Amino acid sequence: MSSQVAKAATQGELLEALYGEVTVQELQETNLGVLTPHRGDQRVVFTPLLPPRTQTRISGVLRRLRPTRNTGGLLYLEKVVVVFTPHVPDDAPGEVEVWIHDSLLPNLNSVGPRLRFPLNGGPRLMAFYPPYSIPLMDKSKEMPRCFAIVSELLSASYVGGGSPFSLHIMWQPQVESLAHNYLMRPPRMQKICRGMVKDALGSLSSRKSYIAGAVSHRFALTAANPLPISGDTAEEAGEASSGEPHWVPEATAPRVRKAT
């Protein structure tokens, strides 16, 4: 006996699969598979991939369908991609640990290995692979069971109210009547290559525009007879006393009106 499977790789496909059983507006608010922000403003931060109220709504909808009547649908995540971005300088202390958690597990235990790395090592790209699906009808501690991303800041302390780092979580769900269970694939991590900000003083035109926007030289002598910077040597070399090259703005020559 075959059973009908309601799958959803994206929110649009889920709406199509359940058309007639639920209004579009009911599932437009589920935020399935969207970019989920995660602020590291506390030492330990827990971000459910499916908020409890949303999960209860989806489970209630899927319980109306015969294949998912007893489970409320089985949620499977093929992968969870996380982008880590620090908000501190490169010499800031501390480490960060990130892992995926199943709320059925006690003490925020991880599903598979955790990833640990220095806070000051620049942005990173991570991927986690939950190897099994969970019933949306399940409850854990009177709350709907869910997968979550957990982060912990180690070996450092910062002033309260700020975020030393952020995570951006990307995932796409599959909700169906069939269960998934695979061998554990360890998480992966790659550093994101960074470059320097463009030199703001690299061109003469940009230096002139910055100076003109903040300093007036309308009372200066002409460019042919500028004021000495620090002795004749510095003036001739075009350098300040510190050895830094300087720029003397051009003075506008006075206009002479011709006699008529």
Swiss-Prot record:
UniProt keyword Transport, yes or no: yes
GO BP terms in the entry: transport of virus in host, cell to cell
GO molecular function, one term: RNA binding
Coiled-coil features, chain-numbered ranges: none
Region (Disordered) residue spans: 230-260
Pfam families reported in the protein's UniProt record: 3A
Keywords of this entry: RNA-binding, Transport, Viral movement protein
Purpose: Transports viral genome to neighboring plant cells directly through plasmosdesmata, without any budding. The movement protein allows efficient cell to cell propagation, by bypassing the host cell wall barrier. Might act by forming tubules structures that increase the size exclusion limit (SEL) of plasmodesmata, thereby allowing viral ribonucleoproteins to spread directly to neighboring cells. Binds to ssRNA.
Record's protein name: Movement protein
Organism: Groundnut rosette virus (strain MC1)
Lineage: Viruses, Riboviria, Orthornavirae, Kitrinoviricota, Tolucaviricetes
